């Protein structure tokens, strides 16, 4: 229930409409968030047509706002994907944590994704090098911000995970992060070095 209030979905299924009993038209979930001694209601109504969420008596504009009100990460049966899954699984988990401690992160992340899509599209369509590289300033700036936010969050997460590992398992657990390009060069240098391969494959290889 807590996860659903914070994410607008269940960690067991992505189809919220399946949570509505066959003989009913909706289900309602409510709770209260206590912040610095101030208690405010949060609630959600799920129907076959979608989800309506409210916080402190007003409609919530989107799931991003909901998540800032009730930040939650779940360790569920699918957590093994963080280890044996691809890097996309780990980035998704990490980025969700960053979003909660750096509210502006989502804006930088979207900006980076937008620039990356344009950069890749220019590569795939075989545009002239100067047209492809025209996206580099936007891509570079957003990528550096995204990478820096991830590194700061991971430093905090590393401390917490290390403490839990020692206390519960008696093990030393450490976490590391690869930025997506060599630490011996800047991202701009990495993009230049991989440009020929990027054009050949229609994909940007260096980046967070």
What are these model-derived regions, one by one?
Residues 6-89, 93-105, 155-163, 188, ...:
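Nucleotide-state sensing region of NTPase/ATPase domains
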Residues 75-144, 148:
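Extended, highly charged alpha-helical segments
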Residues 1:
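Glycine-rich phosphate-binding P-loop
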Residues 4-7, 121:
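Regular, well-ordered alpha-helical segments
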């Amino acid at each position: 229930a807590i996860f659903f209030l914070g994410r607008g979905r269940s960690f067991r299924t992505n189809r919220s409409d399946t949570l509505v009993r066959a003989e009913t038209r909706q289900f309602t979930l409510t709770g209260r968030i206590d912040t610095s001694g101030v208690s405010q209601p949060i609630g959600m109504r799920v129907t076959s047509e979608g989800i309506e969420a409210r916080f402190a008596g007003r409609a919530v504009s989107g799931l991003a706002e909901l998540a800032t009100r009730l930040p939650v990460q779940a360790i569920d049966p699918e957590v093994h994907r963080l280890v044996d899954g691809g890097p996309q699984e780990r980035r998704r988990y990490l980025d969700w944590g960053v979003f909660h401690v750096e509210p502006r992160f989502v804006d930088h992340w979207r900006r980076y994704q937008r620039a990356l899509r344009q950069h890749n599209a220019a590569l795939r369509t075989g545009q002239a090098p100067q047209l492809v590289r025209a996206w580099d300033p936007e891509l570079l700036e957003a990528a550096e911000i995204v990478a820096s936010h991830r590194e700061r969050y991971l430093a905090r997460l590393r401390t917490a995970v290390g403490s839990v590992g020692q206390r519960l398992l008696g093990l030393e657990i450490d976490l590391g992060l690869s930025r997506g390009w060599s630490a011996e060069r800047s991202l701009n240098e990495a993009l230049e070095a991989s440009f020929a391969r990027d054009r050949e494959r229609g994909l940007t290889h260096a980046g967070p």
